[in-house]
Protein backbone atom coordinates (compact mmCIF):
# COMPACT_ATOMS: atom_id res chain seq x y z
CA UNK A 1 0.00 0.00 0.00
CA UNK A 2 1.30 3.49 -0.73
CA UNK A 3 2.36 5.61 2.21
CA UNK A 4 2.49 9.32 2.82
CA UNK A 5 4.71 11.99 4.31
CA UNK A 6 6.15 9.59 6.84
CA UNK A 7 7.32 7.39 4.03
CA UNK A 8 7.21 9.44 0.86
CA UNK A 9 10.04 9.24 -1.63
CA UNK A 10 11.65 6.92 -4.13
CA UNK A 11 13.70 3.83 -3.32
CA UNK A 12 17.12 3.27 -4.79
CA UNK A 13 18.13 -0.06 -3.24
CA UNK A 14 17.89 -3.19 -5.39
CA UNK A 15 16.17 -6.06 -3.53
CA UNK A 16 16.75 -9.77 -3.75
CA UNK A 17 14.19 -12.05 -5.35
CA UNK A 18 13.21 -15.67 -4.89
CA UNK A 19 14.55 -18.51 -7.01
CA UNK A 20 12.34 -21.57 -7.32
CA UNK A 21 10.69 -23.77 -9.88
CA UNK A 22 8.05 -21.95 -11.88
CA UNK A 23 4.66 -22.94 -10.42
CA UNK A 24 1.73 -24.13 -12.46
CA UNK A 25 -0.68 -21.29 -13.20
CA UNK A 26 -4.30 -22.23 -12.50
CA UNK A 27 -5.75 -18.79 -13.23
CA UNK A 28 -5.43 -16.08 -15.83
CA UNK A 29 -2.90 -13.53 -14.61
CA UNK A 30 -2.86 -10.69 -14.16
CA UNK A 31 -6.51 -10.86 -13.17
CA UNK A 32 -7.00 -7.08 -13.36
CA UNK A 33 -4.35 -4.62 -14.50
CA UNK A 34 -3.59 -1.44 -12.55
CA UNK A 35 -5.49 -2.46 -9.45
CA UNK A 36 -3.33 -2.51 -6.31
CA UNK A 37 -4.03 -3.67 -2.73
CA UNK A 38 -6.71 -6.08 -3.99
CA UNK A 39 -9.38 -7.42 -1.68
CA UNK A 40 -11.63 -10.26 -2.86
CA UNK A 41 -14.44 -11.59 -0.71
CA UNK A 42 -16.87 -14.41 -1.48
CA UNK A 43 -20.34 -13.69 -0.16
CA UNK A 44 -22.85 -16.29 1.03
CA UNK A 45 -24.72 -15.81 -2.25
CA UNK A 46 -21.72 -17.40 -3.99
CA UNK A 47 -20.64 -14.21 -5.72
CA UNK A 48 -17.12 -12.83 -5.57
CA UNK A 49 -16.55 -9.12 -4.98
CA UNK A 50 -13.31 -7.31 -5.80
CA UNK A 51 -12.22 -3.85 -4.73
CA UNK A 52 -8.74 -2.30 -4.92
CA UNK A 53 -6.76 0.92 -5.09
CA UNK A 54 -6.85 2.72 -8.44
CA UNK A 55 -3.78 4.62 -9.73
CA UNK A 56 -5.52 7.98 -9.38
CA UNK A 57 -6.24 7.31 -5.67
CA UNK A 58 -9.52 9.18 -6.08
CA UNK A 59 -12.38 6.66 -5.88
CA UNK A 60 -13.54 3.27 -4.67
CA UNK A 61 -14.41 0.70 -7.32
CA UNK A 62 -16.20 -2.62 -7.12
CA UNK A 63 -16.78 -5.53 -9.46
CA UNK A 64 -18.53 -8.87 -9.01
CA UNK A 65 -18.68 -12.28 -10.64
CA UNK A 66 -19.89 -15.82 -10.04
CA UNK A 67 -16.32 -17.01 -10.66
CA UNK A 68 -12.89 -15.77 -9.66
CA UNK A 69 -11.75 -15.64 -13.26
CA UNK A 70 -14.85 -13.70 -14.21
CA UNK A 71 -13.72 -10.78 -12.07
CA UNK A 72 -11.13 -10.03 -14.72
CA UNK A 73 -13.74 -9.05 -17.29
CA UNK A 74 -16.59 -8.01 -14.99
CA UNK A 75 -17.94 -4.48 -15.34
CA UNK A 76 -16.43 -2.14 -12.79
CA UNK A 77 -18.58 0.34 -10.88
CA UNK A 78 -17.56 3.41 -8.92
CA UNK A 79 -19.39 3.17 -5.58
CA UNK A 80 -17.80 6.21 -3.91
CA UNK A 81 -15.72 9.20 -5.03
CA UNK A 82 -13.39 11.35 -2.98
CA UNK A 83 -14.47 14.73 -1.65
CA UNK A 84 -13.15 17.84 -3.37
CA UNK A 85 -12.64 19.67 -0.06
CA UNK A 86 -12.27 18.70 3.58
CA UNK A 87 -11.83 15.12 4.78
CA UNK A 88 -11.57 12.06 2.52
CA UNK A 89 -10.30 14.14 -0.38
CA UNK A 90 -6.92 12.56 -1.20
CA UNK A 91 -5.03 9.27 -1.24
CA UNK A 92 -7.99 6.92 -1.29
CA UNK A 93 -6.15 3.69 -0.54
CA UNK A 94 -6.69 -0.01 0.11
CA UNK A 95 -10.46 -0.42 0.36
CA UNK A 96 -11.80 -3.65 1.84
CA UNK A 97 -15.42 -4.79 1.49
CA UNK A 98 -16.93 -6.74 4.39
CA UNK A 99 -20.42 -8.02 5.16
CA UNK A 100 -21.15 -7.64 8.88
CA UNK A 101 -24.55 -8.97 9.83
CA UNK A 102 -26.94 -7.76 7.14
CA UNK A 103 -24.91 -4.68 6.22
CA UNK A 104 -21.98 -3.99 3.89
CA UNK A 105 -18.98 -1.97 5.04
CA UNK A 106 -15.98 -0.58 3.22
CA UNK A 107 -12.85 0.26 5.19
CA UNK A 108 -10.34 2.51 3.45
CA UNK A 109 -7.65 5.11 4.02
CA UNK A 110 -7.93 8.77 3.03
CA UNK A 111 -6.51 12.21 3.76
CA UNK A 112 -7.96 15.74 3.84
CA UNK A 113 -7.57 18.09 0.91
CA UNK A 114 -5.39 20.52 2.85
CA UNK A 115 -3.04 17.89 4.32
CA UNK A 116 -2.74 14.98 1.89
CA UNK A 117 -0.39 12.91 4.06
CA UNK A 118 -2.65 13.07 7.12
CA UNK A 119 -3.93 9.63 6.25
CA UNK A 120 -6.47 7.94 8.51
CA UNK A 121 -8.95 5.03 8.39
CA UNK A 122 -12.54 5.72 7.30
CA UNK A 123 -15.70 3.62 7.05
CA UNK A 124 -18.62 3.48 4.60
CA UNK A 125 -21.89 1.62 5.27
CA UNK A 126 -24.56 0.27 2.92
CA UNK A 127 -27.67 -1.53 4.21
CA UNK A 128 -28.66 -2.82 0.76
CA UNK A 129 -28.38 -6.54 0.11
CA UNK A 130 -26.58 -5.62 -3.10
CA UNK A 131 -23.47 -3.45 -2.54
CA UNK A 132 -23.88 -1.95 -6.01
CA UNK A 133 -27.24 -0.53 -4.97
CA UNK A 134 -28.49 1.44 -2.02
CA UNK A 135 -26.55 4.32 -0.50
CA UNK A 136 -23.00 4.27 0.80
CA UNK A 137 -23.19 6.32 3.99
CA UNK A 138 -20.03 7.85 5.41
CA UNK A 139 -19.71 6.67 9.01
CA UNK A 140 -16.62 8.76 9.66
CA UNK A 141 -13.11 8.12 10.86
CA UNK A 142 -12.34 4.94 12.74
CA UNK A 143 -10.55 6.28 15.81
CA UNK A 144 -7.52 4.46 17.23
CA UNK A 145 -5.52 5.25 20.36
CA UNK A 146 -3.39 7.82 18.52
CA UNK A 147 -4.36 10.32 15.87
CA UNK A 148 -1.42 9.42 13.63
CA UNK A 149 -0.79 8.08 10.13
CA UNK A 150 -2.95 4.93 9.87
CA UNK A 151 -4.26 2.74 7.08
CA UNK A 152 -4.95 -0.80 5.83
CA UNK A 153 -7.83 -1.76 8.14
CA UNK A 154 -8.74 -5.46 8.06
CA UNK A 155 -11.58 -6.91 10.14
CA UNK A 156 -12.13 -10.56 11.05
CA UNK A 157 -13.92 -12.65 13.67
CA UNK A 158 -12.56 -15.30 16.00
CA UNK A 159 -14.31 -17.26 18.75
CA UNK A 160 -17.24 -14.86 18.80
CA UNK A 161 -15.27 -11.61 18.86
CA UNK A 162 -14.71 -9.16 16.03
CA UNK A 163 -11.23 -7.70 15.63
CA UNK A 164 -9.58 -4.98 13.60
CA UNK A 165 -5.97 -5.25 12.45
CA UNK A 166 -4.34 -2.23 10.85
CA UNK A 167 -1.07 -0.37 10.19
CA UNK A 168 -0.16 2.81 12.05
CA UNK A 169 2.73 5.06 12.96
CA UNK A 170 3.36 4.73 16.68
CA UNK A 171 4.39 8.02 18.29
CA UNK A 172 8.09 7.94 19.11
CA UNK A 173 8.71 4.72 17.20
CA UNK A 174 11.66 4.46 14.85
CA UNK A 175 9.61 2.99 12.03
CA UNK A 176 7.08 4.26 9.57
CA UNK A 177 4.27 1.84 10.44
CA UNK A 178 3.73 -1.21 12.61
CA UNK A 179 0.81 -3.60 12.96
CA UNK A 180 -1.83 -3.26 15.66
CA UNK A 181 -4.87 -5.21 16.83
CA UNK A 182 -8.00 -4.34 18.80
CA UNK A 183 -11.41 -5.79 19.49
CA UNK A 184 -14.36 -3.97 17.95
CA UNK A 185 -17.49 -2.74 19.73
CA UNK A 186 -19.16 -2.09 16.38
CA UNK A 187 -18.28 -1.88 12.70
CA UNK A 188 -16.58 1.51 13.09
CA UNK A 189 -15.70 1.52 16.81
CA UNK A 190 -12.83 -0.11 18.68
CA UNK A 191 -13.09 -1.24 22.30
CA UNK A 192 -10.53 -1.99 24.96
CA UNK A 193 -6.78 -1.78 24.46
CA UNK A 194 -4.95 -1.91 21.17
CA UNK A 195 -1.83 -4.07 21.07
CA UNK A 196 1.26 -3.92 18.91
CA UNK A 197 1.67 -7.12 16.90
CA UNK A 198 4.76 -6.32 14.87
CA UNK A 199 7.27 -3.62 13.99
CA UNK A 200 9.82 -3.70 11.17
CA UNK A 201 12.78 -5.37 12.88
CA UNK A 202 14.40 -7.44 10.13
CA UNK A 203 16.45 -6.03 7.26
CA UNK A 204 13.92 -7.29 4.69
CA UNK A 205 11.22 -5.21 6.42
CA UNK A 206 13.25 -2.02 6.21
CA UNK A 207 14.36 -1.73 2.58
CA UNK A 208 13.69 1.86 1.60
CA UNK A 209 11.24 2.35 4.45
CA UNK A 210 10.64 0.60 7.76
CA UNK A 211 7.14 -0.69 7.12
CA UNK A 212 4.71 -3.36 8.29
CA UNK A 213 1.28 -2.91 6.68
CA UNK A 214 -1.58 -4.59 4.84
CA UNK A 215 -2.59 -7.29 7.38
CA UNK A 216 -4.80 -10.17 6.24
CA UNK A 217 -6.03 -13.17 8.23
CA UNK A 218 -6.67 -16.78 7.31
CA UNK A 219 -7.60 -19.40 9.92
CA UNK A 220 -6.63 -23.01 9.25
CA UNK A 221 -5.31 -26.09 11.05
CA UNK A 222 -5.88 -24.78 14.56
CA UNK A 223 -3.98 -21.56 13.96
CA UNK A 224 -4.62 -17.96 13.06
CA UNK A 225 -2.26 -16.77 10.33
CA UNK A 226 -1.82 -13.06 9.66
CA UNK A 227 0.14 -12.02 6.60
CA UNK A 228 1.46 -8.51 6.17
CA UNK A 229 3.59 -6.56 3.72
CA UNK A 230 6.95 -4.93 4.34
CA UNK A 231 9.43 -2.40 2.90
CA UNK A 232 8.84 0.14 0.13
CA UNK A 233 6.18 -0.26 -2.56
CA UNK A 234 8.65 -1.13 -5.32
CA UNK A 235 10.45 -4.42 -6.04
CA UNK A 236 11.47 -4.58 -2.37
CA UNK A 237 7.87 -5.16 -1.28
CA UNK A 238 7.33 -8.62 0.19
CA UNK A 239 5.17 -10.49 2.68
CA UNK A 240 5.76 -11.63 6.24
CA UNK A 241 3.75 -13.89 8.52
CA UNK A 242 2.49 -13.85 12.12
CA UNK A 243 1.01 -17.00 13.68
CA UNK A 244 -1.12 -17.59 16.78
CA UNK A 245 -2.67 -20.73 18.22
CA UNK A 246 -6.43 -20.57 17.62
CA UNK A 247 -7.03 -21.30 21.33
CA UNK A 248 -4.82 -18.46 22.53
CA UNK A 249 -5.75 -14.93 23.54
CA UNK A 250 -5.22 -12.95 20.36
CA UNK A 251 -4.99 -9.76 22.42
CA UNK A 252 -1.87 -11.06 24.17
CA UNK A 253 1.17 -10.08 22.06
CA UNK A 254 2.96 -13.18 23.37
CA UNK A 255 0.41 -15.34 21.51
CA UNK A 256 1.87 -14.27 18.17
CA UNK A 257 5.03 -15.73 16.64
CA UNK A 258 6.75 -13.86 13.80
CA UNK A 259 8.49 -15.63 10.94
CA UNK A 260 12.08 -14.33 10.67
CA UNK A 261 12.13 -14.57 6.86
CA UNK A 262 9.69 -13.25 4.25
CA UNK A 263 7.17 -15.82 3.05
CA UNK A 264 6.46 -14.33 -0.39
CA UNK A 265 8.89 -12.31 -2.50
CA UNK A 266 9.50 -11.32 -6.10
CA UNK A 267 10.71 -13.87 -8.63
CA UNK A 268 13.09 -13.43 -11.55
CA UNK A 269 11.96 -16.77 -13.00
CA UNK A 270 8.35 -15.67 -13.30
CA UNK A 271 9.04 -11.97 -13.87
CA UNK A 272 6.98 -10.68 -10.96
CA UNK A 273 8.29 -8.12 -8.50
CA UNK A 274 7.14 -6.51 -5.26
CA UNK A 275 4.28 -8.91 -4.47
CA UNK A 276 2.16 -7.97 -1.51
CA UNK A 277 -0.82 -6.32 0.13
CA UNK A 278 -2.71 -9.55 -0.14
CA UNK A 279 -6.08 -10.93 0.83
CA UNK A 280 -7.45 -14.47 0.92
CA UNK A 281 -10.48 -16.10 -0.64
CA UNK A 282 -11.60 -19.60 -1.61
CA UNK A 283 -12.09 -21.17 -5.02
CA UNK A 284 -15.46 -22.09 -6.43
CA UNK A 285 -15.20 -25.56 -4.85
CA UNK A 286 -15.38 -23.93 -1.41
CA UNK A 287 -12.24 -25.76 -0.28
CA UNK A 288 -9.22 -24.54 -2.22
CA UNK A 289 -7.60 -21.47 -0.68
CA UNK A 290 -6.61 -18.66 -3.02
CA UNK A 291 -4.00 -15.97 -2.49
CA UNK A 292 -4.88 -12.52 -3.85
CA UNK A 293 -2.11 -9.93 -4.19
CA UNK A 294 -0.58 -7.30 -6.43
CA UNK A 295 2.79 -7.25 -8.19
CA UNK A 296 4.58 -5.45 -11.01
CA UNK A 297 6.00 -7.20 -14.11
CA UNK A 298 9.33 -5.35 -13.89
CA UNK A 299 11.80 -4.47 -11.09
CA UNK A 300 12.98 -1.01 -12.09
CA UNK A 301 10.85 2.07 -11.45
CA UNK A 302 11.58 5.62 -12.51
CA UNK A 303 10.74 8.10 -9.77
CA UNK A 304 8.41 7.52 -6.86
CA UNK A 305 6.75 4.06 -6.84
CA UNK A 306 3.50 5.76 -5.83
CA UNK A 307 3.34 7.26 -9.30
CA UNK A 308 3.95 3.99 -11.14
CA UNK A 309 0.47 2.61 -11.92
CA UNK A 310 1.36 -0.94 -12.88
CA UNK A 311 0.65 -2.89 -9.74
CA UNK A 312 -1.68 -5.57 -11.08
CA UNK A 313 -4.17 -7.75 -9.20
CA UNK A 314 -3.14 -11.41 -9.31
CA UNK A 315 -4.51 -14.67 -7.88
CA UNK A 316 -3.04 -18.14 -7.34
CA UNK A 317 -3.71 -21.26 -5.33
CA UNK A 318 -2.41 -21.26 -1.78
CA UNK A 319 -0.82 -24.57 -0.78
CA UNK A 320 -0.35 -25.99 2.71
CA UNK A 321 2.68 -27.74 4.15
CA UNK A 322 2.49 -31.02 6.05
CA UNK A 323 3.00 -29.11 9.31
CA UNK A 324 -0.19 -27.15 8.65
CA UNK A 325 1.44 -23.84 7.73
CA UNK A 326 0.80 -21.99 4.46
CA UNK A 327 3.12 -22.56 1.50
CA UNK A 328 3.01 -19.37 -0.55
CA UNK A 329 5.48 -20.51 -3.18
CA UNK A 330 6.47 -17.77 -5.61
CA UNK A 331 4.37 -15.42 -7.76
CA UNK A 332 3.10 -17.24 -10.83
CA UNK A 333 4.09 -16.01 -14.28
CA UNK A 334 1.78 -13.95 -16.45
CA UNK A 335 -0.55 -16.01 -18.60
CA UNK A 336 -1.70 -13.09 -20.79
Segment roles from a protein language model:
Residues 17-19:
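Sec/Tat signal peptide C-region and signal peptidase I cleavage site
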Amino acid sequence: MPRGALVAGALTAVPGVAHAATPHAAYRNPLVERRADPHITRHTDGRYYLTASVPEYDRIVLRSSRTLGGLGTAEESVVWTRHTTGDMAAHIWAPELHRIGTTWYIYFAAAPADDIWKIRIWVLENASANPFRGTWTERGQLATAWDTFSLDAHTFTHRGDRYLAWAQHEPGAGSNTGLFLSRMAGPWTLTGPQIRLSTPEYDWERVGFAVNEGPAVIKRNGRVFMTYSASATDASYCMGLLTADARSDLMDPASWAKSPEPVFTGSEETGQYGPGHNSFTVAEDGRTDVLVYHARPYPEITGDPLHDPNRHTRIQRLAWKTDGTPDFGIPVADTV
